[in-house]
Amino acid sequence: EVDAVIAGLVSGRVLEPLDQDSFRFRHELLREVAEELSPPTLRRHLHSRIADALVSTPGNPDWPLIARHHERAERYSEAASAYGAAAANARQRGALGEALTYLTHAVSQAENCPSGGERDRLEIALRLGRAFLAQAAEGVASQNAAADFERCLALCSSDLADDDLFSTVMSLYPYYTMRADLDRAERLVRSVRAQLTGPRECFLPINEFGLGMLAWYRGEFGYAHEKLEVAANTLTEACSRDLEAMLFMPNDATAGLYTHLALARYIDGDLVGVAAELDRAERRCAEIPFPKGAFSLAYVRQMEILIRAEAGQLQRAAEAAVELTTLGEQHGFDSWALVGKAQHATVGALSALADNANPATLQPHIAMLTAFVEAWRSMNAISLVTFYDAILARLLIASGELPEARERLRIGLELAERTRMHFYDAELLRLRAHTTDDIGARREDLEAAWELARRQDAPIFQLRAATDLFALDGAPAQHAVSGALNGFSEGSSWPEVAPARAMLE
C-alpha cells in the first residue's frame, strides 16, 4: 500500500527518489503545502509514528531527528530525552558545543512538559548535565552553569537526603572555590557532611578533601595537609565511582585530591613528594573518559606550573604551560586555553626577572600580566589571583616602580582580607618590604611575614622572609634562618635551602 502511494507521488512528480529506499519532495514548496494541508492532529499523529519507527529501527538511532519528530508530535518528555541522547553522543565525540546545543533544546522541551515531580526530575537532570558541559567549555566560574545550578536548587526539595539536591549542592563546590567564596563553600561542605551516613558514608574522604582544600586557600597549611592525607588514605575506588555518578562538575575529585596534595607538599619544600602526587594525578586523568579526564589534566597542569615556577624550574613550567594551552585549544576548553596563555606569559616574566632584565625589557611583561590579572578579576575567577599580584609586584619592583608595586600588593592583601584567602599573604608582606627605603618599615614587614609563615606551617615562605631579614640585618637574623630551616627535611632539594644553610656557616 505504501509502495503504491509513493509510486504515484513519484510519477506525479511530487517526490523524487534519492536511492532505493529514500525520497524527497521535488520542491520545498510542495513539502510546505503537504504539511499545511494536514490537520494539526494528523500532523502530530504522523510525527509520532515516524518517531516511534525511527526509534525501533536497528542500528544507531538518529537522536536529533527523533527528537524533532517527538517535538512536532508534542511529546515533550520524549523529545527532551532524545535531545539528551543526542547530547551524550556528541559529548562522546568530543563535540562540546554541539552537546551543549542539544541540551539547551532538551531543557526547552522539558519546560513544556506538564508540571509535576517527573517533569522537575527531568529538568534537573538535563540542567545538571548542561552545567557540567558549560563548566568544561567556559571554566568552573561559568555564569551559565551557575544559572542552571540555581534553577536546580529551586526545583529540588529542601532535604539533602534527596539525591537531586545532593548532586546539585555538591556540584556547586568548585564554582564557589574558583570565586574565592570560601565561607559559602565551607558551609556547603559541612552541610553535606551531616548527610554522609548509611550508603553515603563512603563519601567522607572527599568531604575531608573539600575541607583540606579550603584550609589550604585560607593559609592553614598544617590542617590542610592533615585533611588531604586522611582523604587520600581512606578513599576507595568504589567510592570514587559512586561519587562521580552523582557529581556534575568537570573536575575529577580523585585527581583533584592528588593535585592538592602536591600543593601541600610544595609548601613544605618537598619536591620528591610533589612529583609523586603529580604523577598519581596524571595517571588518574588518563583513566577517565572525555571530557572529565582532559579537563582534570588541565587542572593538574595549572597547579604544576605554579609549583614549578615557585621552585625556579622555569623550563618545565614553560613546557607545562604550552601543554595546558594545547589541551584547551584541542578540546574546546576556552578557559583553559586562556589560563595556559596567561601562565606562559607569567613564566616568561619570571624568566626575564631571573635574567636581571632591564626595566624597559620588563614593561611588556608588566602590561601583559596586568591584563590577565584584571581579566580574571572582572570574571571573579580569583582563587589564585594573589599569586599573580605578587609576581606583578616583583616585576614592578625590579623596574623601579615602587609606588605601583606597593599598590598592587595592597590590592592583593585587601582581597585576601575580604575573602579569607590567605595562602599567599606571607609573600605579599615580604615583597612589601622591598617597596620602601625605610629600614624600620622593611624590618617590620619581613618579621610579620616570617611570623605569619611560621603560624601557617609554611616553611618555604618562612625561609624567604628569613633570608631577606638576614640580607637586611646580617648575623642578628641567623635565628630566623635557623628557625625556618627546621621546617625542612635534612635531604630537602628545595632550591632555597642550600643557600640558606650557607648563611649559618
Residue ranges and their predicted role:
Residues 43-44, 60-63, 97-108, 138-150, ...:
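Helix-turn-helix repeat elements of alpha-solenoid scaffolds
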Residues 144, 151-154, 346, 407-505:
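C-terminal non-catalytic interaction modules
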Residues 63, 71, 75-172, 178-182, ...:
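Flexible inter-repeat linkers and adjacent short helices
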Residues 1-101, 105-113:
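Short secondary-structure boundary elements
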Residues 33, 68, 85-92, 108, ...:
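Tandem amphipathic alpha-helical repeat scaffolds
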